[in-house]
Amino acid sequence: MSVTIIDVAKKANVSKSTVSLVINNVPTVKEETRQRVLEVIEELGYVPNFNARGLTTQKTQSLGVLFTSQTNTTESNFDFNCETEIYPNDILAGIPDALVNTDYGLIIERYSVDNGPDQPLPKMIAQRRVDGVIVIFGLYSEELERRIADTGIPAVAVGGAPVLQDYVSADFQQSVYIATEKLISVGLKKICYVNCPPFFSSNQLRRIGFYRAINDHHLCVEDQRVIDTQWNTGKGGYEAIKELLMSGYMPDGIVTAHDGIALGIIRYLHENGIRIPNDVSIISIENSVLAGYATPALSSVDVNKRELGRKAGEILLQRIAQPTMPKVAMMSTPTVINRDSVKQGE
């Protein structure tokens, strides 16, 4: 007779659910208990039958990753989008770190939010192909959050603070605060913050972080500027700084919502003979792979994207195993990565 999960539980003196948590490598199990269960599994030669388990438990052993974005309607040949391309892929790179030694795989789906509240749910959710889903927040609306919650499929959001679901996020307000503070610390007094478009949920938090730094360091608010880009892209940054400079305002420092916007700004400044950091310093939020390849190399605030992905995976596994556990909400701690785009202090 084959060994069952009940046999393992009895031998290890734990519940069946604890054995299941160990098998799925859920990190909430005490290490002493985990080792005892693993030793019993090896001793008894227990092999989980995931196909049979899927039929009886309705589990797929798959997790979903949902990228929320808009259909690209611009025509620029450098229309890279940090929020819907590089940013989520860096988060995605961390999710498998949480799945090591589990039997879960990933299904990835891009979901356009352009079609309004009546559009179908993402296929992986509507067809119940996954046991849980990680949503890269971006354009994640309250309506979509509610519709996913109504399906009963566990979800963890990355990059925002939904009402109904667990989430992990960069601390957008603090990220912009310390970026602005960095420019102030080297003696800059006319600072422009180039924000993401206003339809992004983090727009207002980022704006608050900027003005909090300005006020805390007693800079004249009237000398500062905040611009919301039309596009969350390199083109958005290019057009925003072009409009600002043509208005006659010349900042000595620029903070941007993410590296993609910063690269568009850098391109415009280069084209118009404005030197970085001699004439204007620039710092961004994100610290993507793009930052080190900019000319000059872009100072940027690291928001720990890979770690956000790993934590999202861990939390989702916990939620699947323990549906009634308290809501989890966590934010990463940002740090400034100094490169060459900010001048030295006076």
Protein language model annotation of sequence segments:
Residues E43-N49, D114-P117, G138, Y238, ...:
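Short gly/ser/thr-rich secondary-structure transition/capping motifs
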Residues V47-Q119, Y211:
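Amphipathic helical "hinge" segments at domain boundaries
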